[in-house]
Amino acid sequence: MASTANDRQQLPNGDASTERIQIIDENKTFTPDLTQQIERWGLRDSGFNYNLVAVFGSQSTGKSTLLNRLFGTTFDVMDETRRQQTTKGIWMCRGKDMSVMVMDVEGTDGRERGEDQDFERKSALFSLASSEVLIVNMWEHQVGLYQGANMGLLKTVFEVNLGLFGKKANDGTSGRTLLLFVIRDHIGTTPLANLQATLIQDLNRIWDSLSKPDDLKDRLLSDYFDMAFTTLPHKVLVPDKFEAEVANLRKRFTDKDNEGYLFKPVYHKRIPADGVAFYMENIWEQVQNNKDLDLPTQQELLAQFRCDEISAAALAEFNEQAKPQKRPIEAGRVVENLGNMMRNWRTQALTRYDREASRYHKGVYTRKRTDLIAVIDSTLSPLFLGQLKNLHKSCLVTFKKEILEGLKGDEYDFGTVVQKARTKCEKTFSEGAKEAVVEEGAAGWSWEEEMELLMEEVGAVADQCRKDETKKMINLIERNVKKLISEPVELHLTKPSTDMWDKVMKTFKDTLDKAESTYLAKAKSFNCTEEENTNALASLKRRAWIVLRAKIEEQTSDQSLLGKLRGHFEERFRYDEEGVPRVWKPDDDIDGAFKKAKEETLELVPLYSRIKPTDSSLEFELPSDGSSDDLTNDEFDFASSLTVLSDTKSLDLINKFRKDADAYYVEAKRSTVSSIAQIPYWMYGVLVVLGWNEAMAVLFNPLYFTFLLFALASAYMIIQLGLTGPLLQVTRAVASEVQKQATNKLREVVGQGQAEAVALQPMRAQRQNETEYENANGDDLRQR
């Protein structure tokens, strides 16, 4: 029964392993379904663990029957009663319980194609290029014949496509093909050895007759082909022997320990099972177009095609794994175990590629693997660099936080805090960076440069923190200096003397020396340079001087200094040398005392006007080197700061003091006048004489005397109990309340009178109008 209607046929039992497929139809078209069919056979993932065998020979010689018996295939067989062509084109089927793909090639010398031998030549060449073992099926009586034994076809194939075999390895150890001649209906009259010798002789004759290139003239057929020969009894006449010999022949295909095992590794075309369809299709295309068949090139093309497919599949899976991690990296987050994940993705992709692609052409496989690694790394590299940047930012933030936390306490060593934070930052970054490296030592996976950038920024942050802490420390020392010099300076300026500025400057220098010692002691842990210490000390001196100058300004303001001058003047004018207050008498020398006290006081104004200690060692000078402290450096003139009172201010102060001193002088003069104008003593005698009767009346009147005693006793008790003040306050409060109540009553009375006046005003106006009206009427009557 012909099988040309369908490309794929399945037996009724539905077993996919028994399906057969027409890979090339009678119109010389290659099927696109071979890859799918190989997968249905379960051979797609076999790699090199499969074999491929083909059969060709004359039409109706039982090729399909032989294959079905040998391999358990399901090819259609000829209807012996009709003797017509059964196999058209090339069919393929899997051997039963065998990893063998079997090709059944259309028979040659058939009446259906007649003189058209093009397909015969192309199918034979296709079979030679694809199969490990090529079974040449012939009858015993065809041995020695040229056409019947297909010698003419083999010669044509060898002659036209000599390049196919010439490009194989010169040592003949690779790319070899086994030609298995199966001689059917062997009677036994002619021994197999004789038949074998005849066939070998014919094949060598064909090979020798070929026109070969100069570099292949000495090559023999055995350099490229191995040949094996076997016979089978008549299938119809001796069926039992036929089946027995077929079974023996089958063992040569299945039993690797068999001495005559046919599927030797040297015959394998090294085409992985998943690439067989593509390889065969390209071979057929080359054969169909009558192009020189270059098997190595075809193998490379197949390798490129399959390696690209495998690489694309591995890359697609890799991209699906890597995609979810892009967003957190772009968002600036550090992804935990990113390096381990990337290495796993990369390893999985390469493992998948290696598992399937390593079976193909070594050069292509290696080249495509390199390309795949480059693509994978180009995807992983942004993740790696992003992870480094995020680690950089995270470590820098942590470093700043660690420093700030370490500087919160009262007692801390700045250098230790910075070093501890720096070590932790460096360790965290290096551990994270090393973990993120996909391939250690490979180009594009270095993180040392990013580490250097991080350390530079860490150094900059540490320097800034050191500067801030230095300023903070200087500010603290400045406040301490201000606190320490405030009271002593105020005391020295309040009690002026010729060595006043010596005392002030000594106090200032002692305090400044302590401040500098405090700074240097703390600055050791800051790892400050000599230049930084010099600038800091210069800034500290300026700040301390400004603090001192501010205190002096406070104590020498107009009111404060005028008060000091008045106090100094009063001590010398109002008090004697022993500090006893003076009560001026008319005969005292007020003018002399006033002049002396005034002159001594005015001598203080030049003393206050300029900071100038008598001891030259106590003179203070600011360093002339520049400082970056803007707070103390803005237009600061040290020379002018030594002047406390300008000439104008001194003159104004002197004038104000003279006015105050003159007031004290006038007051002193008035006190002497008041002592002169006191009541004469004789007036007291007059008062006693004139008031004696009234005094006696009070003393001898019981009522008045009792009231007097009560008043005196009450006054005594109030004074003894200290109730004088509270009593006066109560008296004032009562008087104030009485006054308030009286005022309110008076306002009410006045307000009521005004209201009555307003109410009576309309009535008065009406009466006035009536009076005027009556007067007018009276005048009219008198006129009449």
From Swiss-Prot:
SUPFAM superfamilies: P-loop containing nucleoside triphosphate hydrolases. GO terms for biological process: endoplasmic reticulum membrane fusion. The keyword Transmembrane applies. Residues 47-267 form the GB1/RHD3-type G domain. It is a multi-pass membrane protein. Its EC number is 3.6.5.-. One of its GO terms (molecular function) is GTP binding. Its main location: endoplasmic reticulum. InterPro entries: G_GB1_RHD3_dom, P-loop_NTPase, RHD3/Sey1, Sey1/RHD3-like_3HB. It is found in: Endoplasmic reticulum membrane. Residues 447-487 form a coiled coil. It is an enzyme of class 3 (hydrolase). GO terms for cellular component: endoplasmic reticulum membrane. CDD domains: GBP. Keywords: Coiled coil, Endoplasmic reticulum, GTP-binding, Hydrolase, Membrane, Nucleotide-binding, Transmembrane, Transmembrane helix. PROSITE patterns: G_GB1_RHD3. It comes from the Eukaryota. The keyword Hydrolase applies. GTP binds at residues 57-64. Cooperates with the reticulon proteins and tubule-shaping DP1 family proteins to generate and maintain the structure of the tubular endoplasmic reticulum network. Has GTPase activity, which is required for its function in ER organization. Belongs to the TRAFAC class dynamin-like GTPase superfamily. GB1/RHD3 GTPase family. RHD3 subfamily. PANTHER family: PROTEIN SEY1. This is Protein SEY1. The lineage of its organism: Eukaryota, Fungi, Dikarya, Basidiomycota, Agaricomycotina.
